[in-house]
A protein has these predicted regions:
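Glycine-rich phosphate/diphosphate-binding loop of Rossmann-like nucleotide-binding domains
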Residues: 3, 119-210
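A structured beta-alpha segment of the ubiquitous adenosine-cofactor-binding alpha/beta core
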Residues: 15-20, 24-28, 196-225
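Short coil/turn connectors at secondary-structure junctions
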Residues: 3, 31-35, 84-85, 90-94, ...
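N-terminal glycine-rich phosphate/adenylate-binding segment common to multiple enzyme folds
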Residues: 13-126, 233, 237
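Conserved active-site and cofactor/substrate-binding residues in soluble primary-metabolism enzymes
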Residues: 21, 25, 57, 61, ...
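A short beta-strand-loop structural module common to alpha/beta enzyme folds
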Residues: 4-13
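Glycine-rich phosphate/nucleotide-binding loop
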Residues: 12-14, 219-318
Length: 320
């Protein structure tokens, strides 16, 4: 049996006090109990470091850490109302963005030199690639991914498409990033052909791959009603574009789904910082709570489904 609820304070100052251990604890509790609701959190930048001088480190995104621990995929979908018409007039059905999130490493230098990238295998064999020679200050970023993570992303997307009975679109830029994006394209094709093709065909669903720039044009011309799977930064940008065109980020659900079925619900938007600063100045603010409400109803419905609590699931439906 599980407790009625467990609470973990992911506020910036408490994360600082625990050296971010509370984020790890929250992720592990989410895996243990299967369902969680997460409130919006602050990821510090230079401005926040100045605003909160007690911060000992520019802590990483809690969302990113939780996704990494759970190996989850984020699905974002608009909340549709008859009274709010999409800016794109031909959109009739919701467009769900599936976003794969993985970490990168970046650093800066203030002197001339050269940057190389080296992989050292367990066999002792090394592969080294010259990234760039620079004659002055420069910035570098190294992006990486594990095939197991990409494969989990692909499986989550195909399974979510089957569960929600929606077509699946996937887009990268493999003509430019031939090795990196090419791996994503290959793995999605392998998973589809080997595992999901028969189920898709039985349900009358389509899997479709295209380049990211072509996908954007097709999405704008479409009527909606599909899942659009994107890599990390593509998904971050496109989910905001889709949500704004459907209404606003305040009308967007966000669900993190792990391969083992663990599910975390949250509002797609952040802490609405501008409203908070206006509140501190004594101004009146009006913040749309709809995405937060739907985060709770989603979690309550899932809890009801997992525990056979029909009344709880029905309450979530009625509240929505």
């Amino acid at each position: 049996m599980y407790k009625r609820q467990e609470y973990y304070d992911l506020g910036l100052l408490h994360r600082n006090e625990t050296r971010d251990q509370v984020t790890v604890d929250a992720a592990l509790a989410t895996r243990k109990y299967g369902v969680a609701v997460k409130c919006a959190t602050i990821t510090p930048n230079a401005q926040r470091m100045a605003e909160y001088p007690q911060l000992t480190e520019m802590w990483k995104s809690p969302n990113g850490n939780i996704r990494s621990i759970l190996d989850g995929t984020v699905f974002r979908a608009p909340i549709l109302l008859d009274s709010i018409k999409p800016v794109v007039r031909n959109w009739e059905k919701p467009i769900t963005i599936a976003r794969h999130v993985y970490k990168s490493v970046s650093f800066a230098t203030d002197e001339p030199g050269e940057c190389t990238m080296t992989f050292r295998g367990v066999s002792g064999k090394e592969q080294t690639v010259l990234v760039q020679k620079v004659d002055g200050p420069a910035v570098f970023q190294g992006e990486h991914n594990k095939e197991s993570s990409i494969r989990s992303f692909a499986k989550a997307c195909f399974q979510y498409a089957i569960d929600t009975k929606q077509d699946l679109w996937f887009s990268t830029k493999d003509t430019i990033a031939k090795v990196y994006d090419g791996a994503f394209k290959r793995i999605f094709e392998e998973e589809y052909e080997q595992t999901y093709k028969a189920q898709f065909e039985a349900l009358g669903l389509t899997y479709f791959y295209t380049l990211i720039d072509d996908a954007v044009a097709r999405v704008i011309r479409s009527r909606g009603g599909f899942i659009w799977a994107c890599k990390n930064y593509d998904g971050d940008v496109m989910s905001d574009m889709v949500s704004t065109a459907f209404g606003s980020l305040a009308m967007m659900t966000s669900v993190l789904v792990a391969p083992d079925g663990t599910t975390e619900y949250e509002a797609a938007h952040g802490t609405v910082t501008r409203h908070y600063y206006r509140y501190l100045q004594g101004e009146k603010t009006s913040t749309n709570p709809m995405a937060t409400i739907f985060a709770w109803t989603g979690a309550l419905r899932k809890r009801g489904q997992l525990d056979g609590l029909a009344d709880l699931a029905a309450f979530a439906d009625k509240l929505e």
